[in-house]
Amino acid sequence: MNYSAKLTGEGLKIAVVTSRFNHFITDRLTEGAIDTLERHGVVKEDIDIFLVPGAFELPFVASKLAQKKKYDAVITLGCVIRGATTHYDYVCNEAAKGIAKAGEYGTPVIFGVVTTESIEQAIERAGTKAGNKGGEAAISAIEMANLNKMMDEL
C-alpha cells in the first residue's frame, strides 16, 4: 500500500519559527512560507510566527512548540552564510541536529534553514533563481502534517 498526503492546508494550524539574523533573507523566506500556506488553504489566523535571534535558537522554540501539540506542523526558517571562521559549521550542524531532534515529539518539524557560501546564493534561495525555500518548507509542512494525521488513523 502506498500512502501519499494531500497538499491542502484547510484546517491546519502551523507555527513558523524564524531567525532574525540575516533578516534581509529570513524576512523573504517567511513571506514565501506564509504566501504558500495561504495559497494552499491555511487561514491567516492559523499561522503563528515566532522570532528568535539566530539559527542556533531555532531548535529550542521548535521543540517547545512541537511538545505542546497545538500545531499540526512547525516550520523553522533561518539563513547562515559562511564567513571567514568555523562558526558557520558549528551553527549549521547544531541547528540541523536540534531541528531534527525536535521532530521526535510527534509533530512534523520542517527544516527551512538556508546554508550558503555567499550572500548571492542566499538571495537566490529567497525568491530569485532557486525559488523561495520558505515556500518549499511550507509545502513540506502541509504534506507532513496531513501524512501525520493519516498515520494516526492507521
Swiss-Prot record:
Q: What UniProt keywords apply to this chain's record, in alphabetical order?
A: Riboflavin biosynthesis, Transferase
Superkingdom of the organism of origin: Bacteria
What does the entry give for GO biological process? riboflavin biosynthetic process
Q: Which residues bind (2S)-2-hydroxy-3-oxobutyl phosphate?
A: A84, T85, R125
Q: Which Gene3D superfamilies match?
A: Lumazine/riboflavin synthase
Record's catalysed reaction(s): (2S)-2-hydroxy-3-oxobutyl phosphate + 5-amino-6-(D-ribitylamino)uracil = 6,7-dimethyl-8-(1-D-ribityl)lumazine + phosphate + 2 H2O + H(+)
Q: Does the keyword Transferase apply?
A: yes
Instruction: Cite a GO CC annotation.
Output: cytosol
What pathway does the UniProt record associate with this protein? Cofactor biosynthesis; riboflavin biosynthesis; riboflavin from 2-hydroxy-3-oxobutyl phosphate and 5-amino-6-(D-ribitylamino)uracil: step 1/2
Q: What is its EC number?
A: 2.5.1.78
Q: Which residues are catalytic?
A: H87 (proton donor)
Give one GO molecular function term: 6,7-dimethyl-8-ribityllumazine synthase activity
The record lists 5-amino-6-(D-ribitylamino)uracil as bound by: F21, A55, F56, E57, C79, V80, I81, F111
HAMAP family under this entry?
Lumazine_synth (MF_00178)
UniProt function note: Catalyzes the formation of 6,7-dimethyl-8-ribityllumazine by condensation of 5-amino-6-(D-ribitylamino)uracil with 3,4-dihydroxy-2-butanone 4-phosphate. This is the penultimate step in the biosynthesis of riboflavin.
Q: Which family does it belong to?
A: Belongs to the DMRL synthase family.
PANTHER family named among the record's database cross-references: 6,7-DIMETHYL-8-RIBITYLLUMAZINE SYNTHASE, 6,7-DIMETHYL-8-RIBITYLLUMAZINE SYNTHASE DMRL SYNTHASE LUMAZINE SYNTHASE
Quaternary structure, from the entry: Forms an icosahedral capsid composed of 60 subunits, arranged as a dodecamer of pentamers.
Name of the protein in its database record:
6,7-dimethyl-8-ribityllumazine synthase
